[in-house]
Every structure is written in C-alpha cells, then in structure tokens.
A protein has these predicted regions:
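Small-residue-biased structural context
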Residues: 1-129, 133-219
Length: 219
C-alpha cells in the first residue's frame, strides 16, 4: 500500500497490531521477498525510495538480540555503535556552529574562526566513509553468506546517496568564504540538513536492523 501512495500514518496502527515483536531477520526476509518476487510491480528503485519509511514503521516493533558476544567490549559491533555515537556528537557540534554563525554580523571577524571550526567538524564527520567501507566489506558479505541479499543491496545504494549528500554539503562550506555570506550560510545549512536526515536514518537502520540480523545469524 505504501508503494501505491498510501500515507504511512494511516497504516501505522494496523501495522502495529499485525507485526508486534517482529525480528530483524523477518524484516530482511520481507524486504527480500518484495525485491525478488516476480509477481509484483515494485521495482528496486521503489524499495530504495521508501526504505526510510519501511524502517520507521518497524521502529517500535523490532525485537533486539542480546547475544553475549555482541555485548563484549571492543567487539566489532560495539565499535560500530560507538562510532555512530561519535558521529551524532559531531552532527550536534556542526548544528551548534551553524547557530553561532547565524547570530553573528556578516563583518564580525570571529566569523572566519567559526567557519574554520565548521570545516574541521566536517572533516571529522567525513570519517564515516571508513565506517561505511567496513560495513560494506565486512558486514554485508556476512549477511549475503547467510542468504540475506536484499538489506546489503538497499543499504549500499543508500550509503552512496549519503556520500553524495555529504560531498554536496561540504562544497557549500567551502563557499562560505565567498561573498554573500548570509545567503551562502543558509544554503550550507540546508545542504547539511539534507545530509543529516539521511545519515541519521542510516544509523537507525544499522542499529535496529543490520546489527540485529548479524546477532541473530551468528548466534
């Protein structure tokens, strides 16, 4: 119904009644069935376009997995989650710098210092590339080994979209030293907001779905 334009909010109540306590593996199998079944008119592009909506509908229904090995300190999954926490903190710092820049007069000399600080935070946040590469080279092959081909395919495509959004946002920061600072700042903030939304949605998918599929598969 989502793929035919039905408002997700209209479906959420019925969805919660029928899919209470669904596991991450069940989500993966549903997604796989949608993508690979021949008797439906839903394309991969349709799934990609609505994957954030799909994930959010499952938000309160996904049951976690408390495998002991996943809780061990320095376990790859724990490192993965710690990195996401650091990325969230970096995003908060960037938004705080944007607020500070908006409060300054255009001729305020401290504007350049804040702009430099903003660029440094973008450079730190750009380390998500290592995070994504590890996910794609280590976690995705494990999922495929256990027969879950759809989640890696969808996530990898979204990863590439997020990479493009980050580069677009970074380009706008580089332009902040140009003329028309106020206008440039507004554009830079909007570009970052586009990236931030998709990036945080991916964090949710990683922690609510990807990690749980790995935990259930490896236990």
């Amino acid at each position: 119904q989502l793929h035919h334009g039905v408002d997700p909010n209209c479906l959420q109540e019925a969805f919660n009644q029928h899919f209470s306590g669904v596991s991450a593996i069940e989500i993966a199998m549903m997604e796989q069935k949608i993508i690979y079944e021949d008797d439906n008119d839903i394309t991969f592009e349709d799934v990609l376009k609505l994957c954030n909506v799909h994930a959010r509908m499952f938000e309160d229904q996904v049951t976690g997995h408390s495998a002991v090995e996943i809780e061990q300190e320095n376990h790859p999954v724990q490192v993965f989650k710690a990195e996401n926490m650091a990325f969230r903190a970096c995003i908060n710092r960037i938004n705080n710098i944007f607020k500070a820049l908006e409060a300054l007069n255009e001729d305020d000399p401290s504007r350049l210092d804040f702009t430099d600080g903003l660029k440094r935070q973008y450079q730190l946040l750009g380390q998500f590339e290592h995070h994504y590469t590890r996910k794609e080279r280590v976690f995705f092959p494990l999922l495929e080994k256990y027969g879950y081909n759809a989640p890696p395919k969808v996530m990898w495509a979204k990863d590439d979209e997020i990479r493009d959004l980050f580069q677009a946002a970074l380009k706008q920061v580089d332009l902040l030293r140009s003329k028309d600072f106020t206008e440039r700042l507004a554009t830079a903030k909007l570009a970052f907001a586009d990236f931030e939304y998709e990036f945080k949605e991916m964090i949710f998918k990683e922690e609510a779905i990807l990690i749980n599929i790995l935990a259930e598969s490896l236990s």
